[in-house]
């Protein structure tokens, strides 16, 4: 399959992938921590640093006073839980180390983030497109239509 046939796909030596996750997590006790633009931007830069270190691509990110939204993509060799652990764990460690006053006043237990999170996948093709592309691929591989029985 030619590269131009799969829009926004990532090509590596071993695989091609194109999937995205929408991830949301909240601060511990829903504390409103990122109340200034400076704190919000600092968390964005920390999350970008962590993502870069862990082969995670952040497509979109919003840091709200008490929660974070990210649209991420990462190789299929990485488990979604590993990506979440990296983003939440490392960002909390770096942020609280930089802000001991916030750690002492709001997060006495040393946890910036609530342990829970929401994650969903974002599809980039409809069922019709998937069926059409699968049929197209089958035809390309067999060299002619009708080489294998259809399961329609």
PLM features per residue range, with description:
Residues 1-152:
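Basic nucleic-acid-binding interfaces
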């Amino acid at each position: 399959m030619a590269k131009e046939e799969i829009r926004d796909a990532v090509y590596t030596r071993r695989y091609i992938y194109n999937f995205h996750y929408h991830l949301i997590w909240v601060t511990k006790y829903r504390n409103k921590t990122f109340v200034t633009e400076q704190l919000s931007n600092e968390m964005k830069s920390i999350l970008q640093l962590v993502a870069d270190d862990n082969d995670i691509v952040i497509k979109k990110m919003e840091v709200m006073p008490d929660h974070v939204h990210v649209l991420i993509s990462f190789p299929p060799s990485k488990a979604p839980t590993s990506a979440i652990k990296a983003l939440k764990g490392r960002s909390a460690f770096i942020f609280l180390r930089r802000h001991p006053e916030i750690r002492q006043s709001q997060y006495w237990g040393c946890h910036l983030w609530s342990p829970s999170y929401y994650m969903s996948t974002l599809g980039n093709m409809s069922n019709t497109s998937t069926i059409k592309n699968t049929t197209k691929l089958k035809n390309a591989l067999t060299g002619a239509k009708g080489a294998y029985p259809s399961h329609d």
